[in-house]
Amino acid sequence: VVLIELGGTAGEYQNIVYYEAYRIMKQSLPDDVLLVHVTYFPTPQHINELKSKPTQLSVKNLHAMGIQPDFIVGRAESTIDDKRKEKVAYFCNMHKDDVISNPDAESIYQIPLTFLEQKFDERILEKLKLPKKSAKIQSWKNLVDKILAKKTRRVSVAIIAKYLSTGDYELKDSYTSLLESLEHAGWHSDTDLEIIFIKAESLEKKTKKALEDLHRADGIVVPIGWGSRGVEGKISAIKYARENKVPYLGLCYGMQLASVEFARHVVGLEKANTKEVDPDTKHPVIHDIPFDKKYQTIKGIGASMRLGGYDCILKPGTLAHKIYAKHNAFKDKKKNLITERHRHRYEFNNEYRKKLEDKGFVISGTSPDDFFVEMIELPQKDHPFFIATQAHPEYKSRPLKPHPIFAEYMKAVLKYDNEHDRGTTSKI
């Protein structure tokens, strides 16, 4: 079964060609295609009643395009009662059982169970004329129980962010994969997680709130990013994590900037930088990938990115190797080979490998041809958990199976919370 999501609202001119494509597919293959129409049932506060008119109008727009939805999934603050289901079904040419209630829930992971109670899965199989199957849902129920259960521990993780503000609002959507990956690890370690978003630019300005938030964090994450805005704030947070032995996880840009921070403050290359920020830097520790035929991954205009899944060889004895070995996550254990997803156009400059390694910098993962630096870390004798990767492990974490890096990062954060005396930490 292939799922295709068409965003926006019914009738938007940008989506007309897709609606027409669906209409033709449904006409040609009536038993192989179905449409689930997600609509909103508002509840005006002054009358406290679910209203179905917006849904009726939305379906009317679909009818005007020759489309009849097979299901309506109604988003609402509360459960859609039978009376309103019957009303919607009557005006939208549907069976009442094909109007599915999708009320607000404490956790989004409860929603599959809500659908199961309404036999949504059985109705889909029936309409697609597929064999009926019993849903193997127990592991999911156990997960939901873990999510909703009162946790025995609570920790704080700071994410040094730059994609938060939009007008008067602060949204976390840009970091959804990262947030979910941290939550996955928290659920499976019986830990309640407080996420502290710290704007990188606030760290550059050294605002009181930003510094206080950084100093109270049990772990620090520097995630994906582009461009120069907020870079020095991110680097200052990395320096703080390194010097104070706060568990650190760097993702993509977080690995590149960790390399820059080490080059500046440990190796002594004061002008070290990434060419993305300073094209004329004296010490380009991070530079753009030489996209010759060997490393060209995208054809055409803007062909400048290493995108998709790539293999990596881990160095035995390193933290990275121990993490993947512990979770049996090797693609090929004999070759110490793993695979992770990527999205970057800059990379570690191999001319600086020896200079950094001579000062204790550990390159724990490289591409099979030893060209790309994929993972870096600090020796565990110097720092309990400082690891960064050019890849995006957050894209492979799953609710029932947290990514190994996030699972072990959470353990390090818990250990720090239990052992660390915040009164002795230094300031950035």
What do these predicted ranges mean?
Residues 385-391:
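Short FAD-binding loop at a beta-strand-to-alpha-helix junction that anchors the flavin cofactor
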Residues 1-382, 393-428:
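N-terminal beta1-alpha1 cap of cysteine-dependent amidohydrolase-like domains
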